[in-house]
Regions:
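Charged mid-protein connector segments
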Residues: 119, 125, 141-161
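A short beta-strand-loop-beta hairpin characteristic of the jelly-roll/cupin
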Residues: 79, 83-116
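A short, N-terminal "cap"/entry segment at the start of jelly-roll beta-barrel domains
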Residues: 1-68, 149-170
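Conserved metal-binding segment of the jelly-roll/cupin
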Residues: 111-132, 139-142
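Residues at beta-strand starts and edge strands
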Residues: 69-72, 132
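Short hydrophobic beta-strand segments that form the core of ligand-binding sensory/regulatory domains
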Residues: 92, 135-138
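Conserved short histidine dyad/triad with adjacent acidic residue
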Residues: 52-62, 71-88
Length: 170
């Protein structure tokens, strides 16, 4: 029988938290409160296709764009055209605020209209098109991955589409 080798452990760099602190990083002082800022919906009244990051990174003291320490929210405007979106993120969520169109991503085409939600896994661009004015609210976790210094290696789930028509049935 071989005797185990004992190593002297050091806790100089360790931090200990009870559940209340771990569950509330703001209260424990690990992160600051996300500052309040209103973003005007006038962006959607303008012409052309564009993306507006709802960027608070300067106020948060982190690299941006970032709306919070771990997420970036964006407005996406489509004006009878096409807009490509891309993020180094584990997932992306698109909520359709108005209009109708379609998104090509992950080798599939997703027709959408107001009230629908599309969730995409890591791994590529999304191309949104609309023959009318349309608006999307886009959220992804690129700020968290940037902070951690990592990139997603593979998609961990299949794309998911939630029609607003289905929500009326439940």
């Amino acid at each position: 029988m071989v005797a185990p080798v004992l190593h002297q452990a050091s806790s100089e760099q360790a931090r200990f938290f009870d559940y209340r602190s771990a569950a509330n990083p703001q209260q424990s002082g690990l992160i600051n409160a996300v500052p309040y800022r209103s973003f005007s919906p006038d962006f959607f009244d303008q012409s052309g296709c564009d993306v507006l990051p709802l960027d608070l990174s300067e106020m948060l003291g982190c690299s941006g764009p970032a709306t919070g320490p771990s997420l970036c929210a964006n407005f996406v405007r489509l004006d009878r055209g096409e807009q490509r979106t891309s993020a180094v993120a584990t997932s992306q969520l698109f909520f359709i605020t108005n209009g109708e169109g379609e998104t090509q991503a992950c080798g599939q085409t997703f027709p959408w209209s107001k009230g629908d939600i599309l969730v995409l896994p890591a791994g590529g661009d999304a191309i949104h098109t609309s023959s009318v004015k349309a608006g999307l609210y886009w959220v992804h976790d690129a700020p968290l991955l940037r902070y951690l210094g990592v990139e997603p290696a593979q998609a961990r789930f299949e794309p998911s589409f939630y029609s607003h028509h289905d929500s009326r049935r439940h």
